[in-house]
UniProtKB/Swiss-Prot annotation:
Pathway: Nitrogen metabolism; urea degradation; CO(2) and NH(3) from urea (urease route): step 1/1. It catalyses: urea + 2 H2O + H(+) = hydrogencarbonate + 2 NH4(+). It comes from Corynebacterium efficiens (strain DSM 44549 / YS-314 / AJ 12310 / JCM 11189 / NBRC 100395). GO terms for cellular component: cytoplasm. Belongs to the urease gamma subunit family. Pfam families: Urease_gamma. One of its GO terms (biological process) is urea catabolic process. The lineage of its organism: Bacteria, Bacillati, Actinomycetota, Actinomycetes, Mycobacteriales. Keywords: Cytoplasm, Hydrolase. Its main location: cytoplasm. Heterotrimer of UreA (gamma), UreB (beta) and UreC (alpha) subunits. Three heterotrimers associate to form the active enzyme. It is found in: Cytoplasm. This is Urease subunit gamma. Its EC number is 3.5.1.5.
C-alpha cells in the first residue's frame, strides 16, 4: 500500500489517538501530543460523518476537559487546527481553547 504524505499524517493521528484513549481508559491523564491527537482525530471523524465546520468548532471544546490532561497542558494548547475531509471537500477546522 502506498500512502501520500497527507494520508500518512492522518494515519499517525489515528494511531496516536488510539494509544491516548487506551491510556486514558487506564486512568492516566493525557500529555500534550495525546490531547492534540484525540481532539484532531475526533474532528476528522466528525467531518467524515458530515458535521459542519461550525458545529465541529463548537463541539471541539467538549472533547476533553482539564481533568483529562496533565497539569499545565490546557494552557499549552491555545488552539487546534486540522484539515479534514468533508463530503464537499477538504476544509480547515480551528478550535480555540479546546480544553476548558
Amino acid at each position: 500500500m502506498h500512502l501520500q504524505p497527507r494520508e500518512q499524517e492522518k494515519l499517525m493521528i489515528v494511531v496516536a489517538a488510539d494509544l491516548a484513549r487506551r491510556r486514558q481508559a487506564r486512568g492516566l491523564q493525557l500529555n500534550y501530543p495525546e490531547a492534540v491527537a484525540i481532539i484532531s482525530y475526533e474532528l476528522m471523524e466528525g467531518a467524515r460523518d458530515g458535521r459542519s465546520v461550525a458545529e465541529l468548532m463548537s463541539w471541539g471544546t467538549t472533547i476533553l476537559n482539564r481533568d483529562d490532561v496533565q497539569e499545565g497542558i490546557a494552557e499549552m494548547i491555545p488552539e487546534v487546527q486540522v484539515e479534514a475531509t468533508f463530503p464537499d471537500g477538504t476544509k480547515l477546522i480551528t478550535v480555540h481553547t479546546p480544553i476548558r
